[in-house]
Amino acid sequence: MKNTIQSILGLFLMISGAVSAQNPIIQTNYTADPAPMVYNGRLYVYTTHDEDDSTWFTMNDWKVYSTNDMVNWTDHGTILSYNDFEWAKRDAWAAQCVERNGKFFMYVPMWSKTNNKGAIGVAVGDSPFGPFHDPLGKPLVQSEWGDIDPTVFIDDDGQAYMYWGNPKLKYVKLNEDMISYSGNIIEVPMTEESFGKRDGKPNPERPSKHEEGPWL
C-alpha cells in the first residue's frame, strides 16, 4: 500500500510539474550538481540527471527547476541534451547558466568526439528554460579529461570569466558575446596555502584539499 501511494504521488508530481516543499526538493528524478541562477526575482536550479537504471555516471541531459518562495518548485523538465551538440558523444555533467543582455548561456561539459577527451560547450537561449541551441558547432574549450565543471563570473566592470577544471583550475576571459574568449587559458596554481593541504598520504600531482569546481 505504501509503495502504491508513493507511486501515485510521484506520478501526480510528474504530471503537474510542481514540487512542494520537501527534502530533498527533487524526488521524482535522480539529480545532482545543482547550479543556481537568480533572474527577475526567481531562483532557477540547473541539474544533471542520472538515468534510473544506471550504476555509474549515465548522464544524458540537463534539467531545470524554479521557485519564487523556496517552498514550491516548478519542474521545467529536460532543457538540453548532449545529443544537441553534434561534436559530443556522452557525459552531460555539471553545468552553469548565466544571463547577459537578455540571453541565457549554458556552459556544459561533455565528452568530445573530436579528441576523445573532456570539453566544454556553450548553448544559448532566450529564456531560462530554453530552447537552447549550440551557436558554435564545436567546443568552446577542449584539451584534456579535466575540462569539466564550468562556471561563469561577471565582474563589476562587466568582464566575464569562465572558470573550470578538476583537479586543475583554469580560467579565460570571455568576450562580450559570451561564446568566445580572448587571450590564453590560464592555469591557477593549486597551492596548499590557497586550497588547503590534502588529508592522508601526500600526492605530489594532487597536493591540495579542495580541487573540484565550480569554483565561484
Describe each region flagged by the PLM:
Residues 1-22:
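Bacterial Sec-dependent N-terminal signal peptides
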Residues 20-216:
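Carbohydrate-active catalytic/glycan-binding domains of CAZyme proteins
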